[in-house]
């Protein structure tokens, strides 16, 4: 399995979180995948991204992004490195496109499917992360559950459901003691959507 992971570890607010997420995913898939990792500096160079996804030896590929996002696509250094209305050819050979990014499901996810990606998973609203260390795992565990399910040959639909169940477990554990964090997790859970063929197995 070919897996492209992007991370914006240099981001001032969430760089450490994006890096931790990418490290967890890399560890889960390291024994079963051909992984290419593009970090902040490489994402600032359009040519590097283009060469990676157009490499004939790297298709089909799965794409997991841990960067900021907007309706049109994914962001590094306040600029889109992928998005709607350009680089349509990138997604012709994409299997699963997953974004841990704000808003990218609104337009970009649908665009990726239209251009040929088999499946997209991401958020249709702005997502929030509590950055204090004591809260970190509440936000990471649903991601981990999703990725572990994929690695165990569950289809995307079931894997998303596993992530949402984990979100609910985290919410329930906080509901009586920290209503604010529980409400943030609830919003993140409910904004997680899936487009395309959710029956695919990686």
Segments predicted by a language model, with ranges:
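Ser/Thr/Gly-rich flexible loops in soluble cytosolic domains mediating phosphotransfer, phosphorylation
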Residues: 85-109
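A domain-level signal for caspase-like cysteine endopeptidase catalytic cores
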Residues: 1-66, 96-99
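Short acidic, S/G/P-rich loop/turn micro-motifs used as interaction or catalytic elements
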Residues: 9-14, 43-45, 68-74, 103-106, ...
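Active-site-proximal C-terminal subdomain of hydrolase catalytic domains
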Residues: 105-202
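Well-ordered, non-membrane alpha-helical segments in soluble/globular domains
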Residues: 17-25, 46-50, 77-85, 139, ...
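A short, glycine/acidic-enriched catalytic loop
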Residues: 69-93
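Extracellular/periplasmic catalytic domains that process cell-envelope and extracellular macromolecules
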Residues: 56-57, 90-92, 113
């Amino acid at each position: 399995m070919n897996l492209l992971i992007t991370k914006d570890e240099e981001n001032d607010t969430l760089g450490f979180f994006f890096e931790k997420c990418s490290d967890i995913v890399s560890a889960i898939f390291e024994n079963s995948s051909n992984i290419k990792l593009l970090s902040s500096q490489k994402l600032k160079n359009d040519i590097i991204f283009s060469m990676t996804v157009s490499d004939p030896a790297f298709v089909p590929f799965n794409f997991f992004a841990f960067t900021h996002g907007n309706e049109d696509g994914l962001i590094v250094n306040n600029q889109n490195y992928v998005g709607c209305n350009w680089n349509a050819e990138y997604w012709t050979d994409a299997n699963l496109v997953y974004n841990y990014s704000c808003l990218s499901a609104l337009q970009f996810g649908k665009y990726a499917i239209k251009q040929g990606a088999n499946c997209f998973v991401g958020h249709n609203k702005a997502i929030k992360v509590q950055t204090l260390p004591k809260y970190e795992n509440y936000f990471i565990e649903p991601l981990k559950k999703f990725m572990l399910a994929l690695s165990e040959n569950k289809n995307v639909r079931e894997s998303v459901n596993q992530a949402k169940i984990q979100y609910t477990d985290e919410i329930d554990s906080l509901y009586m003691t920290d209503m604010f964090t529980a409400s943030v997790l609830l919003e993140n859970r409910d904004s997680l959507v899936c487009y395309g063929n959710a029956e695919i197995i990686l």
